[in-house]
């Protein structure tokens, strides 16, 4: 064993065992020569003990570098996995927000579309109402009660019962399935009867079928059969619901002229 090896082996001992035994002159010279040779090998880098120590240190270094490299690889992989997880979560959140925003925009547009359609429907209803009002010509034409007070209504005469204006409005101005087949000559006779004080015998004979429908058991000039009145009112309401916009300009002018005549008679 060389001196360097003994130094490493006995570095923890308090005293060198060689110091316990005194050396002779020959042993000292031999020991000195051994140390000088060992120092020379250390300088030249050929000392076995030094080379073994360097190899051991090199192996320890390589092991530590390998451990450090593995730890670095583990951290890189862990960071990559966390990055992918966070990117996936961020992408899902982005898609969810885009979908929510799209639904909100579509809902807002549908609401605006619904309001526009409602406004259009209200405008159409208003236009139809304006058309009905133009056809009615006046509120007196709609309110039948204002036209029921006829001249000489209280005069109890045994003459042929004349038709009331309500009957004329209900069965001629607003024709039904039953009155649609009435000939035009009969309608003209009814108009003349309304405008005259007393009907002629021919007009009375033409008007008698209509009179039996409206006034089965008359007691005075203003009383009518309730069933005929109800039916006339229903027919009038159906005609109004269907809309009066289908009337021609000739019908409107004729109705206005008739209304003016009735008002002139009352005056």
UniProtKB/Swiss-Prot annotation:
It comes from the Eukaryota. Residues 208-252 are annotated as: Disordered. Signal peptide: none annotated. One of its GO terms (cellular component) is chromatin. InterPro entries: Sds3. Residues 221-241 have a biased composition (Basic and acidic residues). Keywords: Chromatin regulator, Nucleus, Repressor, Transcription, Transcription regulation. Its main location: nucleus. GO terms for biological process: negative regulation of transcription by RNA polymerase II; transcription initiation-coupled chromatin remodeling. Component of the clr6 histone deacetylase complex I responsible for the deacetylation of lysine residues on the N-terminal part of the core histones (H2A, H2B, H3 and H4). Histone deacetylation gives a tag for epigenetic repression and plays an important role in transcriptional regulation, cell cycle progression and developmental events. This is Transcriptional regulatory protein sds3. It comes from Schizosaccharomyces pombe (strain 972 / ATCC 24843).
